Swiss-Prot record:
The lineage of its organism: Bacteria, Thermotogati, Thermotogota, Thermotogae, Thermotogales. It is found in: Cytoplasm. It comes from Thermosipho melanesiensis (strain DSM 12029 / CIP 104789 / BI429). SUPFAM superfamilies: YebC-like. One of its GO terms (cellular component) is cytosol. The keyword Phosphoprotein does not apply. Keywords: Cytoplasm, DNA-binding, Transcription, Transcription regulation. This is Probable transcriptional regulatory protein Tmel_0985.
Amino acid sequence: MSGHNKWANIKHRKAAQDAKRSKIFTKLIREIIVAAREGGGDPETNPRLRAVIERARAANMPKDTIEKSIKKGTGELEGVDYQEIIYEAYAPAGVALYIYAMTDNKNRTAQELRHLLSKHGGSLAESGSVAWLFERKGIIEIPKDKVADFEEFAMVAIDAGAEDIIEDDPIQVVTAPEKLTEVKDNLASNGFEGEAKVTFIPKNTVKVTGADAEKVLKLISVLEDNDDVQEVYANFDIDDKEMEEIMAKLEG
């Protein structure tokens, strides 16, 4: 899972630096609207809304934008009716893609994704052919510099209900999705504040190198640039150094 975590961390760092901030806001607004629609507008009783609000604040989204998005979700303000859809696909080298989208037009989104996949050596897959390769989990990311003693932190995390702890930067605390908020709050009460999200972790990975690695990362980058795509989960395993080099090349 470390390969895809590295990819996520690179994207997170880029987001703080480049012109894609407006695109990130667009995606976060959709998540807030859907979370409020599904679970109500009070983040204290809606863990999903609470988590996305925290991410929006971390991205420096204005408070007014957050509040208006919540009201669009609850129906207090007029808003677009977004649907959550999972598209399953394959990238070059047999890498499985689990594409999470929010759209107001399923046909448009499917057509656009089919075009992007075809253009970059991928293809849409039949429903169910990829889903079994991924496991839904909660992830809490704790900045490594906030943890002085990893072993001590790991014990605290396990006592808090964590299933696994991955020593990376940021440190990844893995939980059952339904325990995400509980574990996050327990860690926070012990002085470890972190960003929480629900994600899909591959059960096994496909080692990819060279030209294939570049094609896979290019395809995922292009897919995530699509306004309707919230996140692309993949089961690739690409060496960290090679991934950094490819990303620098793609950005250039």
